[in-house]
From Swiss-Prot:
The gene is atpF1. GO terms for molecular function: proton-transporting ATP synthase activity, rotational mechanism; proton-transporting ATPase activity, rotational mechanism. It comes from Desulfosudis oleivorans (strain DSM 6200 / JCM 39069 / Hxd3) (Desulfococcus oleovorans). F-type ATPases have 2 components, F(1) - the catalytic core - and F(0) - the membrane proton channel. F(1) has five subunits: alpha(3), beta(3), gamma(1), delta(1), epsilon(1). F(0) has three main subunits: a(1), b(2) and c(10-14). The alpha and beta chains form an alternating ring which encloses part of the gamma chain. F(1) is attached to F(0) by a central stalk formed by the gamma and epsilon chains, while a peripheral stalk is formed by the delta and b chains. CDD domains: ATP-synt_Fo_b. This is ATP synthase subunit b 1.
């Protein structure tokens, strides 16, 4: 509502100025009346006292009528502002509570997720350990097999070398025996037998 084309804040300021001015005027009137009354002895109720009371009543009624709507409007606006502020604060409180619940839920989920990640890492570690152990056992088995083959090869090589040495020694010994014990007649007879076998 506009009073003489004024907005609410200007109207409030004007009402405050009017109230302060009227109170100052009344106080000045009481001070002047008291000053004049100090010269004479109190006489009781005087005609000016009636006018003063009437003046005060008119002023109070005028102030009441003038300020009733602006003060009521200001108080209503203030009450509405406080209600809006309370509603806004309640909404913020509710949002904060929901956000807190969401954060708590996320923290619980993060705890569960962290436990799951740790469990996954443990499983991966156990699987890696099993793979490493299996690989190490396979490598050890291969190394053992290769060592066994190498030992067998070395034994076989040593056997063949030993056989060859024994054979060479036997041949040398047989040759020595043959050269010692063979006579020219035996030699001639052996050559004849060999030639007969070769021709056949």
């Amino acid at each position: 509502m506009r009073l003489f084309g004024m907005c609410e804040s200007v109207k409030k300021k004007a009402a405050v100025i009017v109230v302060v001015s009227l109170m100052a005027f009344c106080c000045a009137g009481f001070a002047v009346a008291a000053e004049h009354g100090a010269e004479a002895a109190p006489k009781g109720w005087v005609a000016t006292d009636t006018f003063r009371v009437m003046n005060f009543a008119v002023l109070a009624i005028a102030l009441f009528l003038l300020l009733r709507k602006p003060v009521a409007g200001a108080l209503n606006n203030r009450i509405a502002g406080i209600r809006e502020e309370l509603a806004r604060l309640e909404a913020q409180k509710e949002e904060a509570r929901k956000a807190l619940e969401a954060y708590n839920e996320r923290l619980k989920m993060l705890d569960k997720e962290a436990e799951k990640i740790i469990e996954d890492y443990k499983k991966q570690g156990e699987a890696a350990k099993a793979r490493i152990m299996e690989s190490a056992q396979a490598s050890a088995a291969k190394l053992e097999e290769q060592a066994r083959r190498n030992i067998d090869n070395e034994f076989e090589s040593a056997r063949q070398k030993l056989r060859l040495d024994i054979f060479e020694q036997a041949v040398a010994r047989a040759e020595a025996l043959v050269t010692e014990k063979i006579t020219p007649d035996d030699q001639h007879r052996l050559v004849e037998e060999y030639l007969d076998k070769a021709v056949l």
